[in-house]
C-alpha cells in the first residue's frame, strides 16, 4: 500500500511540473508578436519564386535582427499542438492550422525555449520541404545548423523545389 501511495505522489509531482511548464510557456506565448524576424523572413523568402536555385541560405546570417537559438518548422495542416508540445517541449501559438494548405509550412524562431514570433507561413504548390520530418511533422534545428540550399527536388517530374538542410560535417 505504501508503494502505491509513493507512486501516486511521484505522478502527482510530475503532473504539477508539467502543468507549471505548460502554463509558463502559455504566458510566454501571450507576448508573441510580429517581429523583425517575420519581416526579414517575408522579405527574403516570399514569394518563393524569387529564390535562386542552388543558392545557400544561412539562417544565422540572414536573421540577425534579434536573438534566437533554434528554428522550428512545422508541416501543415496536420498539426497537433499537444503532441508536439509533449514531444518537443515547444508550445505552438493558437492558430487555425487546419485550414492551411498541405503545401504550407509554419516557421517559428525560438529563444531560450520560447517561440518569439507569430506563425510565418511558407511554401507553395510546387514546394516540398524534404528534411526528415518526424512523425509529428516538425523539424527543430539549432541556429548554427540552420543552413539550407534551395534546389530542384530530385525525385520530381513536376518541377518541385525544396529548401534542403545542408548537413554539417
What are these regions (language model features)?
Residues 15-18, 92, 126-127, 162:
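Polar low-complexity intrinsically disordered regions enriched in Ser/Thr and small residues
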Residues 1-5:
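Positively charged n-region of N-terminal signal peptides that target proteins for export
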Residues 9, 107-110, 149:
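Compositionally biased, low-structure terminal segments
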Residues 8-9, 14-88:
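N-terminal export/targeting and maturation segments
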Residues 128-169:
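C-terminal partner/receptor-binding element of secreted or periplasmic proteins
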Residues 56-126:
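Mature extracytoplasmic domains of secretory-pathway proteins
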